[in-house]
């Protein structure tokens, strides 16, 4: 085998290793019940994949949406996302666990979670009509030593699990739950931030009457937002501005 072929194979293996390191949500636990997610590393290759609460996506490379796609529907629930067919039931005020398959330690960044009312059946809602309210967000935890300790680091340490509380005051109904990691390891450059959105259909029970006004998925971020174009290797003493609309506060 020639040296050039060996080098080429080594490069491909390195690229495959990097891609394999990116994760996705394999399932959630809501009110103590487990619901399987959309297994993007398996289901796209099946002739009859199972129905799930998760929205399907064509991101079989376990890739991301960057700033060039922020005005595209791909940013809403990932690339070419299609509605989940099932629904998880969760009581207002209770917790949901998002179980990520894995996550690269180098891909530091925030975890952000949104809710959007479907105003009907989430299995048929047009994703471009959804209006998202930010219900949970965690970013920089410790910036004393760049690149710092981030929400994703805490998630990794917690067995690749992130936990979010559904606001107790939230109105009952059908919602799309949008959960994402934004990887900032290349975000010092324009369009360097990497978004990994994941969507799930849930039905909230109990609760109150709050909902929030919401923001269209294609308007959540701009590629020049301070929390999107952000150098994690610089001085972090000034903190980190989590991107997107304001956090819900009932």
UniProtKB/Swiss-Prot annotation:
Biotechnology note: Lignocellulose is the most abundant polymeric composite on Earth and is a recalcitrant but promising renewable substrate for industrial biotechnology applications. Together with cellobiose dehydrogenases (CDHs) an enzymatic system capable of oxidative cellulose cleavage is formed, which increases the efficiency of cellulases and put LPMOs at focus of biofuel research.
Reactions listed under catalytic activity: [(1->4)-beta-D-glucosyl]n+m + reduced acceptor + O2 = 4-dehydro-beta-D-glucosyl-[(1->4)-beta-D-glucosyl]n-1 + [(1->4)-beta-D-glucosyl]m + acceptor + H2O
Residue(s) carrying Methylhistidine: 22
Cofactor: Cu(2+)
pH dependence: Optimum pH is 8.0.
Temperature dependence: Optimum temperature is 60 degrees Celsius.
Protein name from the UniProt record: AA9 family lytic polysaccharide monooxygenase B
Name of the coding gene: AA9_B
